[in-house]
From Swiss-Prot:
GO terms for molecular function: ATP binding; GTP binding; guanyl-nucleotide exchange factor activity; identical protein binding; magnesium ion binding; nucleotidyltransferase activity; tRNA guanylyltransferase activity. Its EC number is 2.7.7.79. Binds 2 magnesium ions per subunit. One of its GO terms (biological process) is protein homotetramerization. Homotetramer. Interacts with MFN1 and MFN2; functions as a guanyl-nucleotide exchange factor/GEF for MFN2 and also probably MFN1. Its cofactor is Mg(2+). Keywords: Cytoplasm, GTP-binding, Magnesium, Metal-binding, Mitochondrion, Nucleotide-binding, Nucleotidyltransferase, Transferase, tRNA processing. It comes from Rattus norvegicus. This is Probable tRNA(His) guanylyltransferase. Gene3D superfamilies: 3.30.70.3000. Mg(2+) 1 binds at residues 58-59, 105. The lineage of its organism: Eukaryota, Metazoa, Chordata, Craniata, Vertebrata. GO terms for cellular component: mitochondrion; transferase complex.
Length: 298
């Protein structure tokens, strides 16, 4: 009797299970269409494993943008701080970015070697960084340019480059900082010749043609009494963004024994926050001070 009863109860359950499986298979089949072959034309842009993924953004036609929006020459601190604010937003909103470096109208974002964010698709890295950065630039514009309306939306192009070792990554960042120094020294002399000596842009270019670093430093010092080494670090070295653990002390009410109820105590908590630095990336000193950036990635 028990065997017969069990068979009759189990039978409807088994039938229901079979029917459900058939419906699921039918649903999958119906979800496909004759047009689905177009997916075969999509390019596999998966980044190679065990490589640092670097996304570099550059402002599109920013010479014109800076001119139209009355940027100060040779450097506008408002524009540089706005760029850094946008970069901070990118690092806070997106995943696996361990360090960023920016100067002028460009920023580079370094994703962890082991990142599997969006299955390491280069198009996702590039488009998400570019869109987050560009939208942040518009969103925070008024915080830095209170008296200058945004006349038209800015644009940023992006590229993805893979670096297979810690040394190649360090060399990349050193290259970008060396570029910052070369460009800023030239621009500092160029605009001094225009603004203080009254030269035209063409005349200033001719004056600087063929000059070396020592020559430019000499022009600045002898003609304009400017010691380039005393120029702000942000202009000369660019900005580095890193995550740092900091101790935060706050006074707050906490649960205490009855005899101490109502009292406040200072509570220290460790948290990770973004820190902006204007320091040397060239050489080993920075990497010795921040070993956590490269640790555990090989």
């Amino acid at each position: 009797m028990w065997a017969f009863s069990t068979a009759r109860i189990g039978s409807p359950l088994a039938a229901t299970s079979v029917t459900l499986r058939r419906c699921l298979r039918l649903g999958v089949a119906m979800a496909k269409s004759k047009f689905e072959y177009v997916r075969d034309f999509e390019v596999d842009d998966t980044c190679l494993p065990h490589c640092w993924v670097v996304v570099r953004l550059d402002g599109r036609n920013f010479h014109r943008f800076a001119e139209k929006h009355n940027f100060a020459k040779p450097n506008d601190s408002r524009a540089l701080h706005l760029m850094t604010k946008c970069a901070q937003t990118v690092m806070q909103e997106l995943e696996d970015i361990v360090i960023a470096y920016g100067q002028s109208d460009e920023y580079s974002f370094v994703f962890r070697k082991r990142s599997n964010w969006f299955k390491r698709r280069a198009s996702k890295f590039m488009t998400l960084v570019a869109s987050q950065f560009a939208s942040s630039y518009v969103f925070y514009w008024r915080d830095y340019f209170e008296d200058q309306p945004l006349l038209y939306p800015p644009g940023f192009d992006g590229r993805v480059v893979l670096y297979p070792s810690n040394q190649t990554l360090k060399d990349y960042l050193s290259w970008r900082q060396a570029d910052c120094h070369i460009n800023n020294l030239y621009n500092t002399v160029f605009w001094a010749l225009i603004q203080q000596s009254g030269l035209t842009p063409v005349q200033a270019q001719q004056r600087l043609k063929g000059t070396l670093t020592a020559d430019k430093n000499e022009i600045l010092f002898s003609e304009f009494h400017i010691n380039y080494n005393n120029e702000p670090h942000m202009y000369r070295k660019g900005t580095v963004l890193v995550w740092q653990k900091v101790n935060e002390v706050r006074t707050q009410e906490i649960r205490l024994p009855a005899e101490m109820e109502g009292e406040k105590m200072a509570v220290t908590r460790t948290r990770t926050k973004l820190v902006a630095l204007n320091c040397d990336l060239i050489g080993d000193a920075f990497w010795k001070e921040h070993p956590e950036i490269l640790e555990g990635e090989d």
